[in-house]
Amino acid sequence: GLGDVYKRQLIMYKIIEVKQSVFEDNNKDANKLREECKDKGVFLLNVMSSPGAGKTTTLSRTLERLKDTMRIGIMEADIDSDVDAKTISEYGVRTIQLHTGGMCHLDADMTRQGLHEMGMEDLDLAVLENVGNLVCPAEFDTGSTKNVAILSVPEGDDKPLKYPLMFQVCDVVLINKMDVLPYFDFDVDKCKKNILYRNSNAKIFKVCAKTGEGIEDWCNWLENEVKALKE
């Protein structure tokens, strides 16, 4: 009857209200954190991708190249393991593990806690390796200076069309695993077109974390961005 319809509407309304206030509060926190990072000269990089796209390997390559030129700290977000944090800590950079307790993303407040725990005053570059997921992490602003999405060749060139928000919020997209291009039906030009359709300002780098292809261009870009923040 009508009562049921009303109840259903009420439930929907409540859910929307709660979600909206969560986003609004998070956006305020994120903007505050972005200001704090800028004031302290810390470049906060938020790295997102689906599981297995090569976040940790790409980060390892990036660290190899940049760890001697700047002070870097890494925050590894995982639902419940520390495998990635162990891998990264072998590079001798400050690494902390953030367990999200089952949540599929990090928000600005968790990121802030992680940064303070790491001692952000002593960092030039703080990298947040977000939870492997193409949906939730894109919805929550972490307060980052820049967002990076890693898209691997085996995932397909249509990912930017299927996950619009991820590619809309990203400043940079790394097309990773270029070494397996011959074995997959992946059109690089089409992929670039799809990315730019979602976000005409996105920077795109073709890389292979395994062989090191394209990593230098990506690292040069990042190094210049980190310097520019301090000017």
Q: Which sequence ranges carry the predicted segments?
A:
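Nucleotide-state-sensitive switch-loop elements of NTP-binding domains
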Residues: 14-35, 40-48, 53, 57, ...
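Short, small-residue-biased leader/transition segments that mark boundaries at the very start
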Residues: 1-6
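Short beta->alpha connector loops at strand-helix junctions that form conserved
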Residues: 97-100, 151, 176
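Conserved Switch II/interswitch segment of TRAFAC-class P-loop GTPases
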Residues: 133, 143-161, 171, 178-185
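Short, glycine/polar-rich helix-capping loops at beta-to-alpha or helix-loop-helix junctions
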Residues: 81-85, 159-163, 187-194
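Cofactor-binding loop segments of dinucleotide-utilizing enzymes, especially the Rossmann-like FAD-
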Residues: 77, 152-153, 209
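Canonical P-loop GTPase G-domain recognition
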Residues: 181-231
